[in-house]
Regions:
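Short alpha-helical transmembrane segments in multi-pass integral membrane proteins
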Residues: 1-24, 84-151, 193-249, 306-371, ...
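Hydrophobic/aromatic residues in alpha-helical transmembrane segments
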Residues: 25, 41, 80, 121-122, ...
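Transmembrane helix-bundle signature of multi-pass secondary active exporters and lipid flippases
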Residues: 28-82, 146-153, 242-309, 329-337, ...
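Helix-loop interface residues and adjacent transmembrane-helix termini in multi-pass membrane transporters
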Residues: 36-39, 47, 53, 87-90, ...
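Membrane-helix interface/capping residues of multi-pass secondary transporters
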Residues: 42, 53-56, 93, 122, ...
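Small-residue-rich hydrophobic transmembrane alpha-helices
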Residues: 56-116, 153-172, 280-344, 375-389, ...
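Hydrophobic transmembrane alpha-helices of multi-pass small-molecule transporters
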Residues: 68, 183-188, 213-217, 289-293, ...
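Short runs within selected transmembrane alpha-helices of multi-pass transporters and secretion channels
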Residues: 146-164, 175-183, 201-214, 296-300, ...
Length: 465
């Protein structure tokens, strides 16, 4: 007879160092695998004979639309995962199950609406995001397949996040690794053997996510789980949905801002450097994404620990997990800095053999990343506000770097430095965002120092207290 799953009470009692290792390592592996998952498509597409450079530029044009899809997924999924972590800390299993059911229903609705809208206006959207007559075909071929599988993608990432937040990070990691490995196998088969090109890469992606989603649904229908989908789980409780969407608003706006900013970036790159510049920036984004995902893996490990202990009123543990996560994130961004500034040619050569594209990507990588050393800490700080349900602060930090600082610089810097000014806008905005974060996180830590474990968190202003 299977043993009934219990809430992960170790989150409130075990050593923070041990917990962070247990929860962050699977998250790091899963998020690194996720970044490799995206990189695999770019690597194979960049080496398509005769059209690799234009194809990878076309793929880069789809990034804003992919970011917007991700934004809608995080609007639902992150809020639900955060609520479930806190509810498990409070041992409120009934409401946690309702949150899970709401997450599935909302993801289906949002994913379907997004798919229908984008398919109706796909060509104008892609032109708006920076496509040219040369790259539109590749961007359209890729996005059509991705959009047909959009509901699958939303559900896959949403349920994977909840599996991790409910105390099973190894399973979440395993599903991600399985998806990456399967995608690495299917990509060359569909792209080269079947001659499907970029459409083959997209189809492989959707198939892999569908297989992992099927197992995730099975996992949440098992009777031995404290967190499970009830029969007839396609239902919506607006109070729960409102709270979940409120908490997820921060990462939603961050990803939406990323979509808008990427559109501005592509338009400026096309203006000052043409399709080649968009392809170069696409390669740089894939390289940066690898290191960002490692930091996000630490964030994923921190989130259930911070959320549970906040729900249990153990504020000293919340502060400790934040400080430890910040330290490790800074170490990771140190490696990111070294790779960008001293070994750019090694990183870029993975994606393309085109000499002109390689030269522009290598120069751009050096210009974009001199301030990344402090970016990891800034990401962890933003994640802490999100994990504690501090919606307004999370939203502001999510938007400050991209909209408040980066967008104006994208239009100002090229006036003086041409295409290099577009790349130089990134480190300047990173530095300004980190100063803003320092002020806000310092204020939060001072408030934590005034709270004793067990006190009501009124002074913190959390939406889920």
């Amino acid at each position: 007879m299977p043993q009934t799953q219990t809430a992960p009470t170790e989150l409130g009692s075990e050593s923070i160092g041990i917990l962070l290792k247990k929860y962050a390592v699977p998250g790091i592996i899963a998020m690194t695998a996720s970044s490799l998952y995206n990189m695999v498509d770019s690597i194979y597409i960049g080496h398509i004979p005769g059209s690799g450079s234009l194809a990878i530029s076309g793929l880069a044009v789809t990034f804003p639309l992919m970011n917007l899809s991700t934004a809608l997924g995080t609007l639902v999924g992150v809020g639900a995962a955060t609520m479930i972590s806190v509810l498990l800390g409070q041992r409120n299993y009934k409401i946690a199950n309702k949150v899970l059911a709401n997450e599935v229903t909302l993801n289906c609705i949002v994913g379907l609406l997004f798919t229908v809208f984008c398919l109706m206006f796909l060509d104008p959207i892609l032109y708006f995001f920076g496509a040219s007559a040369n790259t539109l075909k590749y961007a359209r071929d890729y996005m059509e397949i991705i959009l047909y599988g959009n509901v699958i993608t939303h559900l896959y990432f949403g349920l994977n996040s909840i599996i991790r937040s409910s105390g099973n990070p190894k399973m979440a990691m395993g599903l991600t690794l399985f998806t990456v490995i399967l995608n690495s196998i299917l990509d060359p088969i569909f792209i080269f053997t079947f001659g499907m090109g970029v459409r083959g890469a997209a189809l492989a992606t959707v198939i892999c996510q569908a297989v992992s989603l099927a197992y995730s649904i099975y996992y949440f229908t098992r009777k031995d789980n404290v967190l499970r989908l009830p029969k007839g789980f396609f239902s919506l409780e607006w109070r729960i949905a409102k709270d979940s969407l409120s908490i997820g608003m921060g990462p939603f706006l961050m990803n939406s801002a990323s979509c808008i900013v990427t559109m501005f970036i592509n338009q400026q790159l096309l203006k000052y450097g043409g399709d080649l510049a968009i392809g170069a920036c696409g390669i740089i984004n894939r390289i940066n994404f690898l290191f960002i995902m490692v930091v996000m893996g630490f964030n994923q490990g921190m989130q259930p620990i911070a959320g549970y202990n906040f729900g249990a009123r153990k504020y000293s543990r919340v502060r400790e997990v934040f400080l430890r996560t910040s330290m490790w994130a800074t170490i990771i961004t140190g490696f990111w800095f070294i790779a960008s500034e001293f070994f750019p040619e090694v990183m870029v050569s993975i994606f393309t053999n085109d000499p002109s594209l390689k030269e522009m990507a290598e120069k751009g990588l050096r210009v974009m990343n001199p301030v990344v050393l402090v970016v990891g800490w800034q990401m962890v700080s933003t994640n802490l506000f999100q994990s504690l349900g501090m919606v307004r602060k999370s939203i502001f930090l999510s938007l400050s770097r991209q909209l408040l600082y980066l967008v104006p610089l994208l239009y100002l810097m090229p006036l003086f430095f041409d295409i290099h000014g577009v790349f130089a806008a990134f480190p300047i905005s990173d530095a300004l965002a980190c100063v803003t974060t320092l002020v806000m996180i310092g204020n939060l830590m001072r408030k934590f120092s005034r709270l004793k474990d067990g006190d009501e968190p009124t002074i913190l202003g959390s939406a889920i207290s």
